[in-house]
Amino acid sequence: MGKTLFQKIWDAHTVGILPDGRTQMFIATHLLHEVTSPQAFGMVRDLGLTVRHPERTFATVDHIIPTDNQAEPFADATADAMIRELRRNCAENGIRFFDLPTGLQGIVHMVGPELGITQPGMTIVCGDSHTATHGAFGAIAMGIGTTQVRDVLATQTLALSPLKVRRINVNGKLAPGVRAKDVALHIIGLLGAKGGLGFAYEYGGEVIDAMSMDERMTLCNMSIEGAARCGYVNPDRTTVEYIKGRLFAPTGADWDKAVERWLGFASDADAEYDEIVEIDGASIEPTLTWGISPDQNTGISGSTPNPSDAADDDERKMINEALEYMKFPADMPLKGLPVQVCFVGSCTNGRISDFREVAALIKGRHVAPGIRALAVPGSQMTARQCEEEGIADIFREAGFEWRLAGCSMCLAMNPDKLQGDQLCASSSNRNFKGRQGSPTGRTLLMSPAMVAAAALTGKVSDAREVFSLN
């Protein structure tokens, strides 16, 4: 009987089985940022312990970083204290910290892949919800809480419960103008915001095989929005070529050995899955959210739902709550809905390929009057690449605010925030109430191409029509 990638990695990292049935797992790589690590370091210190494997631990700063002016001290005293605390903790424990002056700082889920830290076959954890991003490389990557961050710092292990594995096959071919973000939102809408509870998602099929690593990262990044503990893609030659030559990638004879080992983690042809879901890629259209959860979404040709069509009282209640918060009527077409803010960035869609695509679409055009448009690269490496390729200038000339690297408007932990009831077309990952900084601000999740279309027209628009992508 063959094994899935999940089973292979789980078995390879099992230290032992605990009396309660959980598995004590060795953690290959631990990623840190400034928000969830201070308390964990404090607990380790209070216990009289030290960091067990600093060489397997990497840190960066991303959530609280201002993206307009990163001169220190920061205007926000709390943010300034947080970065200083992370510096202290990393220095005291010998942890590699990709700080602002290094030129390698960025969102943690971009820094790991860009530097070659993220590799197939690893167990990877971080005190951040979107750690599943690293699963794009054929790793088992999970977000953890602060007490678990403490445990990994002190022991390099973690007590975890086994997961079921759901294989999600997306076959056929995507229509022109349909992107990885649309696939991710479609899957979440199909399976639900709680559909992945207790599961690891294995993404496969012709559409996934054809995706670039950036696209696979977008897909895996959104796994948690469907409640999956992790999501991954089997490693292949696309994976290998992405890692090759990066700062932490193996070299020489070690490279050849690593590649052979990495590819061996891919699920066997006769592996058995707990569930298999089949999706026709051709059926997916540009997709966007209409409510306050990522599963509340529809294709660009769709409308807000009618509560009277709900399957049960619970669903009816959720629809009513979402429509009330979003200030939308039932049965309202989303196409043509005016927006006030547009955001390209985040660990979901803040990569070089995202900015290349949008730059090609907006070149020679301009943001619609009255629209605030932000472009925020997810890392300093990506920002430099955009400057070198002339991409940043295209955004500036089109009327976008070109920002420094950080999480920015994805969440309300830095100065980039919505005001009042503003409606934002966003390439980020969550549309929860108040997520983007204003307690009444509203978010429409969509692909970068769709954000670009909204920025140029001032309203929700079909990117295929605006940019003649058909």
From Swiss-Prot:
Q: Which terms are listed as keywords in the entry? A: 4Fe-4S, Amino-acid biosynthesis, Branched-chain amino acid biosynthesis, Iron, Iron-sulfur, Leucine biosynthesis, Lyase, Metal-binding
Spell out the residue ranges making up region: Disordered: 294-313
Q: What organism, scientifically named, is this protein from? A: Akkermansia muciniphila (strain ATCC BAA-835 / DSM 22959 / JCM 33894 / BCRC 81048 / CCUG 64013 / CIP 107961 / Muc)
- Name its GO BP terms in alphabetical order: L-leucine biosynthetic process
Record's compositionally biased regions (Polar residues): 294-307
Known cofactor(s): [4Fe-4S] cluster
Q: In which pathway does it act?
A: Amino-acid biosynthesis; L-leucine biosynthesis; L-leucine from 3-methyl-2-oxobutanoate: step 2/4
Where [4Fe-4S] cluster binds, per the record, is at 347, 407, 410
- Gene name, per UniProt, is leuC
Is Amino-acid biosynthesis a UniProt keyword of this protein?
yes
- Would you tell me the protein name for this molecule? 3-isopropylmalate dehydratase large subunit
Q: Which SUPFAM superfamilies match?
A: Aconitase iron-sulfur domain (SSF53732)
Q: Under which EC number(s) is this enzyme classified?
A: 4.2.1.33
Q: What does this protein do?
A: Catalyzes the isomerization between 2-isopropylmalate and 3-isopropylmalate, via the formation of 2-isopropylmaleate.
Catalysed reactions, as listed in the record: (2R,3S)-3-isopropylmalate = (2S)-2-isopropylmalate
Record's keyword annotation contains Heme = no
Into which EC class is this enzyme placed?
A: lyase
How many and how are cofactors bound here?
Binds 1 [4Fe-4S] cluster per subunit.
Question: GO molecular-function annotation terms?
Answer: 3-isopropylmalate dehydratase activity; 4 iron, 4 sulfur cluster binding; metal ion binding
Family to which this protein belongs: Belongs to the aconitase/IPM isomerase family. LeuC type 1 subfamily.
A Pfam family cross-referenced in the UniProt record is: Aconitase
> Tell me, how does this one assemble?
Heterodimer of LeuC and LeuD.
